[in-house]
Regions:
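Intrinsically disordered, low-complexity segments enriched in polar/charged residues with Gly/Pro
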Residues: 11-12, 105-107, 193-195
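Non-catalytic accessory regions
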Residues: 1-83, 90-99, 110, 162, ...
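Generalized protein targeting/export and membrane-interface segments
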Residues: 53-155, 207-221
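Short, highly charged low-complexity linear segments
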Residues: 35, 52-58, 149, 184-204, ...
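A generic "cationic amphipathic patch" detector
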Residues: 39, 105, 181-182
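Short, charged low-complexity intrinsically disordered segments located at boundaries
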Residues: 26-28, 55, 117-124, 172-174, ...
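Short, hydrophobic/π-rich interface segment
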Residues: 154-203, 210
């Protein structure tokens, strides 16, 4: 069926990140263009006095630091990788916490872990974004994002970790459209348990250490 104005208001009122999920769903379904979603997002933030945690100046500083630290300039898709990781770190600060330490990145062809969340980005170019970690860290990561406690890794923990990746990737897709005129779509997330991820093209693994454990973020272009 169709999404009504009342449905939109109810969804927007539920949780801080729900308006992002709603917007990305509407874009994926063709109900909104990326430009329309961006306008609606700005209007919603203004009406509800929602502000980004990081200013434009801070974003530029973060962007430059990431580029210098990870040496993405050596990769043919340097701009894409730098923009993606800048957004990722902003969303980690916003949704998970700023108590993390970025570790040196490595170029990989495959990666094995107890839990891997995968989402593909398709369009003018193709990319793959992943979160890989052990069970304890995976559950703690989901707890921070959901602001709930979990006792075991189950479908809800998977859905929560997948929701973080989808929110981040959805915002990345919107930014690519608005800032660079690049139209992209997202595939549904996939989950691997005790598996190994095989990657094509250039793939960077970016470890991030939190007090609760190490998360490995992978971006392949």
């Amino acid at each position: 069926g169709y999404v009504t104005a009342d449905d939109v208001e109810k969804l927007l009122a539920q949780q801080p990140t729900d308006y992002l999920l709603l917007g990305q769903t509407l874009v994926n379904n063709g109900a909104l263009t990326n430009a329309e979603f961006e306008k609606a997002l700005k209007d919603y933030k203004a009406e509800n006095q929602i502000t980004d945690d990081i200013s434009d100046n801070q974003t530029e500083t973060l962007h430059n630091l990431i580029n210098e630290f990870y040496h993405f300039d050596n990769d043919e898709n340097a701009r894409i990788c730098t923009d993606y990781v800048t957004l990722l770190f902003k969303n980690l600060i916003r949704f998970i916490g700023d108590d993390f330490t970025p570790m040196e990145a490595s170029v990989i062809k495959n990666f094995a872990a107890e839990h891997i969340v995968i989402q593909k980005i398709n369009g003018k170019y193709n990319a793959e974004a992943c979160i890989a970690t052990d069970s304890k860290t995976y559950m703690a990561f989901a707890e921070r994002f959901a602001k709930e406690s979990f006792t075991e890794v189950d479908d809800f923990v998977n859905a929560t970790a997948g929701e973080f990746l989808n929110v981040n990737d959805g915002l990345f897709v919107v930014n690519e459209s608005n800032e660079h005129g690049v139209e992209l779509t997202l595939t549904p997330q996939k989950f691997l348990e005790n598996g190994e991820l095989a990657l094509s093209g250039t793939a960077f693994c970016i470890p991030v250490n939190y007090p609760f454990g190490k998360l490995n973020f992978i971006i392949a272009t």
